Amino acid sequence: MSQRHIPVYRPSGDALLLFVLLVARVRIDTLAEWAAIPTPMLHHDVATLLSSIMPAHSLALLSDRQTTDPITLLLISIAFGLFLVYLVVDWLRDRLSLRATFRIKFCLVCTIVGMLVFGQAGLFIALRHVSAPAAYAHDGGVIQTEVTIQYLLAGVNPYVADYQNTPMAEWGTEYRTALYHYPYLPWTFLFSAPFYLVSTAVIGWFDQRVVYLLLFAITLGLACHLTRSATSRLGVLIVLGLNPILASDVIFGQNDSFVLFWIVLGFWLLQLAEERQRDARNPGRLHNLSMVAVGMACASKPTAWFLVPFLIGYQWRTMLPCVTDGGCWSKQILAGLPGLVQRIWPLVLTFIVITGPWFVWHPAAMVDDVWHWSAGTAETPYQIRGWGFSNFVLALGLVPTRLAYWPFWVVELVIAVPLLAAGLWWLWRNPGLATVLQGYAILLFGFLYGSRFLNENYLGFLLAIFTITFFMACPYSREPDQGDAQAALA
């Protein structure tokens, strides 16, 4: 008598991916708190914050022999409880409709990200408010950017002024050469200034992370819409939302998520423009807006500049069928240049309008802050550090100190030029938005690897770009169909 075969349950790929990133996210969060914040100070400030909400005895029990704080522990417990529900839904996926399974999973992931990223960031914002301006925040992305907004409103050039008499100085002076430089571009403080004015007028204080959190939430939604299937939408939400490094950057307030938003917005608009063009509708306005968004990214941080060659190559390649008539290449190039300029000019104009006035105001100071400081040629340069080629320079003793100059530009050129050529060649053969992002990410990674510093926040940013690239390039699937995904995201 034959026995009925019962299939063995195997977790879906998205469940396994969520579990891996959830564990990584929690471990990194707790280690980051332990490394960056003195535990007694953390417990004291949390007790002050919750003095009227939780009994002191409960706080003491949660704080006993812990390297993190009671609120973070509760957020972690909620997140793992939600993951248990996720596993049950995944277990029952054959008994539930595809639409119901996707919607429940999507909502659970959103809630988990909300707990571990937005909830944790909200906690640090509140702790900073009851503690000190230099506490629970990144020095450059939060503290220094807030000071530049104050300089802006006072008519002071942030590229000329120093930051010795600001909360930045409380971080210490050894290797803190950013006290004499603002290494970011003007859009970082120009965009945030209205939020500063509204926040200080309404509640009396401001935290730059409010801007980052708002833009990160929009980034997650836009990134989901860049993909072509519900499975890809769920995957990009998991990896982007629980990015082991980028999520910590959002929590502490580094500004890579700010740059990421403008890039994702630009590509979302460009994708809409291409869809409109395929439907024989005029895509001009959407296309121009997409270039404006990328221009804003370029006016925020130099890491976005490496995207421009691939955007130019993509625009030229997609125009080529319109100008190719079997003639020689020189004629094709000359025929295509006016159209290329017409497509790219909003990006260039946006960058010039945002950065130009500051450059004209004091060009030497701006170049020194944005370029010479990171290149090691400023009077007070950035240190040699990170996870890239620079460690070999230190290991071989090629510099007397970590602040000394070494010609990393040679290594950068040796790595970046072939990567740029290969990326443009591949883009020419395989034109597509995912190919543009892929070439950008590989070129930026190669350049940063050979640079003076490959900081961990750059890797989180690169992981975000690679994540979007991967899921954008995934083939279309109708399990569940695109309408279900759109309904869940609505």
Language-model features, listed with the residues they occupy:
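Primarily membrane-embedded glycan-assembly and transfer machineries that use lipid-linked glycans
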Residues: 2-109, 113-279, 313-456, 469-470
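Nucleotide-activated chemistry modules centered on ATP-dependent adenylation/adenylyltransferase
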Residues: 111-112, 485-489
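Amphipathic coiled-coil alpha-helices
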Residues: 262, 269, 286-288, 293
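Residue-identity detector for glycine
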Residues: 284, 326-327, 483
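Transmembrane helices and adjacent periplasmic/lumenal helix-loop junctions
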Residues: 288, 292-316, 353, 452-458
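Short, Lys/Arg-enriched, Gly/Pro-containing loop segments at transmembrane-helix junctions
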Residues: 367-370, 476-486
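Transmembrane alpha-helices of multi-pass inner-membrane enzymes
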Residues: 459-477
